[in-house]
From Swiss-Prot:
InterPro entries: DNA-dir_RNA_pol_insert, DNA-dir_RNA_pol_RpoA/D/Rpb3, DNA-dir_RpoA, RBP11-like, RNAP_asu_C, RNApol_insert_sf. It comes from the Bacteria. It catalyses: RNA(n) + a ribonucleoside 5'-triphosphate = RNA(n+1) + diphosphate. The N-terminal domain is essential for RNAP assembly and basal transcription, whereas the C-terminal domain is involved in interaction with transcriptional regulators and with upstream promoter elements. Its EC number is 2.7.7.6. Coiled coil: none annotated. It comes from Hydrogenovibrio crunogenus (strain DSM 25203 / XCL-2) (Thiomicrospira crunogena). GO terms for biological process: DNA-templated transcription. This is DNA-directed RNA polymerase subunit alpha.
Length: 329
């Protein structure tokens, strides 16, 4: 196996061309024949489907009870305004959600720049037009922003807590990546001419740097394939019913997350030894940990998100008896 790996060429990063803050072209070569399409297609699919971002998920407009309304003095109807709100490229730096407001009197053109931001929020396309107001018209609304991955359809919940009259749910496209294309060209190393060169072109909405998007996509691909590196048959052990209640990932030690030494030591100081211990902690609770700042917290959240996990998860009957017995041994 080692001999085969040594025979394969190891690609190197040849060039990173930044077209602008939204667009980058990355060139990778040399690749063995066929690897250009293999890696290019895998990275493209991950970039389009699995990059975290933020989006407006709810809007509450003064005087509007449902999305089929019209607002006096406003050129656009409510449905058009909602479609425009979906195009706002918004970035949350630390928090996972935010409440924003917008208030404007006519005559005026309402743009994304009119949204009143807090210290944690940025808008990357402030010139985006949301509505046109005539003389005497007024538009006032509250907006809810959340972080997420991929696409989430608007669901009008029947729960009393979220079924408030006038709360308009929006379909949310959280992905900051707008387009991804790749090109495979011929490459040459000495006498070999049957090699690939991969050119990856990524365009984002500005909330995520294109180069960072490629790095994150490669990290996601790495974690999805790592289980195949040490592929072994594992004997299925019949455990008590209590043990089966938990996903095996919760029983893994936090060391498996490969956090920085600083973050790992902070967690151990708080007696957080397993992933199941960690996901039950709230952000506010972790921020009270000595020497664990916002940067370390973001690292923890990003690593958990790569595994489909998040903080503030409630696990009934935790910890299982097997972990309790191990810790007391």
């Amino acid at each position: 196996m080692q001999e085969m790996l040594e025979q394969l060429l190891t690609p190197r990063l040849v060039d990173i061309k930044t077209v602008n803050g939204f667009n980058s072209r990355v060139t990778l070569e040399p690749l063995e024949r066929g690897f250009g399409h293999t890696l290019g297609n895998a990275l493209r699919r991950i970039l389009l489907s699995s990059m975290p971002g933020a989006a407006i998920v709810e809007a509450q407009i003064d005087g509007v009870l449902h999305e089929y309304s019209a607002i006096e003095g406003v050129r656009e109807d409510v449905l058009e305004i909602m479609l425009n709100l979906k195009e706002v490229a918004i970035k949350l730096n630390e928090t996972s959600e935010a409440e924003l407001t917008l208030s404007k009197k006519g005559p005026a053109v309402v743009t994304a720049a009119d949204i009143q931001l807090n210290h944690d929020t940025e808008i990357m396309n402030p010139d985006l037009v949301i509505a046109h107001l005539g003389e005497g018209a007024e538009l006032s609304m509250k907006l809810k922003v959340e972080k997420g991955i991929g696409y989430r359809a608007a669901v009008q919940s029947s729960d009393s807590e979220s079924a408030n009259i006038g709360v308009l749910k929006l379909d949310a496209s959280f992905s900051p990546v707008k387009t991804v294309s790749y090109e495979v060209q011929n490459a040459r190393v000495e006498q070999r001419t049957d090699l690939d060169k991969l050119i990856l072109n990524v365009v984002t909405d500005g909330t995520l740097d294109p180069e960072d998007a490629i790095k994150q996509a490669a990290t996601v691909l790495h974690y999805q394939l790592i289980a195949f590196v040490d592929l072994k048959h594992k004997e299925i052990v019949v455990q008590e019913e209590e043990e089966n209640e938990f996903d095996p990932i919760f029983l893994q030690p936090v060391d498996d997350l490969e956090l920085t030494v600083r973050s790992a030591n902070c967690l151990k100081a708080e007696q957080i030894y397993y992933i199941g211990d960690l996901v039950q902690r709230a952000e506010s609770s972790l921020l009270k940990t000595p020497n664990l700042g916002k940067k370390s917290l973001q690292e923890i959240k990003d690593v958990l998100a790569q595994r489909g996990l998040g903080l503030g998860t409630k696990l009934e009957n935790w910890p299982p008896s097997s972990l309790v017995s191990k810790e007391s041994a």
